[in-house]
UniProtKB/Swiss-Prot annotation:
Binding site for Zn(2+): 21, 24, 42, 45
Protein name in the entry: TATA box-binding protein-associated factor RNA polymerase I subunit B
Taxonomic lineage from the root: Eukaryota, Viridiplantae, Streptophyta, Embryophyta, Tracheophyta
Any GO BP annotation: nucleolar large rRNA transcription by RNA polymerase I
Protein source organism: Oryza sativa subsp. indica
Localization of this protein: Nucleus, Nucleolus
Amino acid sequence: MDDDGGGSPGHYGGGGIHLVCEYCGHGSEYAEDDADNGFFTCRQCSAIHTSTQNTATNPFDFPMTPAHLSAHRRPTQPTPTPKPFPAPRGAATGAAAPDFDDLGEPSEPRDFATGANAWGNPEDVAARVRWRYVRGLQVILQRQLEALVERHRVGSLAASLAGTIWLRWVAASKVFDEMWVHKMLAIAASVEEGHSASKDKQSELEGDAQKSQSSYEFLFLRSLRMMLPVYSTLAVCFLACHVARETILPTDICRWAMEGKLPYVAAFTQVDKLLGSSLNDCPLSSRQLFRPTRVIGAWQLEAAAGSIAQKIGLLLPSVNFYLIAQRFLKELSLPIEKILPHACRIYEWAMPAELWLSSNPGRVPSRVCVMAILIVALRVLYGINGQGIWESIAQTENAVGSDPEASAPHSIEPDSNNSEEFDARELLCTLAASYDKIDVGHDYSKEVHSYLKYCKDVVFTGMTFSLEEEHLIDIFWDMYKGKEVMLLDENAKLCQEKLRTTNGVNKRCRDGRFADTKCCSTPLGNCALQSIKSKMEENGFCYVSPRKRLVSDGYLLYTRRESSGSLIYVAHADYYILLRPFAKLAEVDVRVLHSSVLKLERRLGWIEERVGRSLNTLQNLHDEASDDERPVSD
């Protein structure tokens, strides 16, 4: 091996490179061939090493004897200090980014940490890391807005608003505060003083400057991620869509970010293309700076957007109830012309506070409040108050279930004497069918091929492989594609044989699943009723028998019942059938939506009671005034 001392040390005496992970503390021995583009990856947590501890020695750093004893014998003279790397190009914060074709990659692999003086003093390191981090987040936000406009049909107004919100958010976070660097250095000094007591003299001599440099870098990065989290770009996108009155929900943003349709998980690869290589002006790579550990949930995303609006002093409107409710009704295949006007009246009448964004992560999301208003409107319009409508549907199926050619419950003939009951029956049947059609799963989870492609393009993007590994991956891909074609042919044949043997006997039960032959051997209505009871128990509900008579015309408020030492919700079957497709579409638990419905109904009842009292008071005042104006008879 020809080496003049400028590269990595070779393996002499069976030794290697001992690296200790900065994240999990796991140490392991590495060889030169284990490096990936000059970087070593932790075998415990897959983090990339930026600081190293070299336990091997380079024999070319010492004078060679004829017997080459210096490579095997402990040197008596002190180890010479290696020369620091030259200052990187484009170190100034105001330097222009290089062209895309000439990224200015370093000529030597960074398999060891840079020298103590390579990046200057800690103040310069903090300025470089901060400038690179803020510019990189702005690039990611720009890519996300482009994807929203081009792929998801978001108006250009949202993109223009996002720029203003982002600048105000950066200013409010005080990330460019002059005292920030001094605070971080003071924290780093206190941490080093705590560790200095446990260090011996030998450990202080081995790479102490490099460890101090690395600790400064990651201390700055942790502070920046607390002030400007990576997920704040998603929150700014949603906040801009909310202000622009778009129908984009937090669930949409999170799903697109998870599936790679919105640049987030793999967006760090685009930062280097626009800003150049991070090794030129920052000691940390783009993967370390902008790679998120996880995708934030929809609940936390809405709270983050509300927190940003609160910190920048932005007065927010309520959600665009009309368009969002119209979208939900369309996805559930419900009559928009009949339901939406009544829902809008309830919205204008109640105006619940949950329709505004909040920074409280424990509050119910705004989309749940929209769903609650729609459910209350449906209960008022169709009279779904536990009268046993679903049980009557099950009895109808039981009566016609013995005839294989009987029509499905969706096409039950209406009763001329009771059209309202028919409307409610059709509503529940439509909701039961829509519950099966709602698909809240990710696209990459539908088949193995899409999942493997997702892992290649999103999860493991930015990782390089050797030629042998790439060739091996291509072989495995070809083998998988061949087996996939064979499996598709076999599945098609099995489906055709199954259709011929069953001859169309399988029917869809009211709970949304297909009943097999064993289920259909029992009465069809009992099968559907027992299935819905089991589903209610799984979701924390207790089935209640239908009401025999209506006690009052007010709202039906359900209470909780104690069962096995815990409180569970009680509900009728028809109300649960109405509740669960809305909860699935909003991607929340059924109990959360049920609690929101009860809260809204209590608020409406309180408003109606106050209005009734006010009207009675006005009527009494009017009568008293009329009596006073009446002339006194002689």
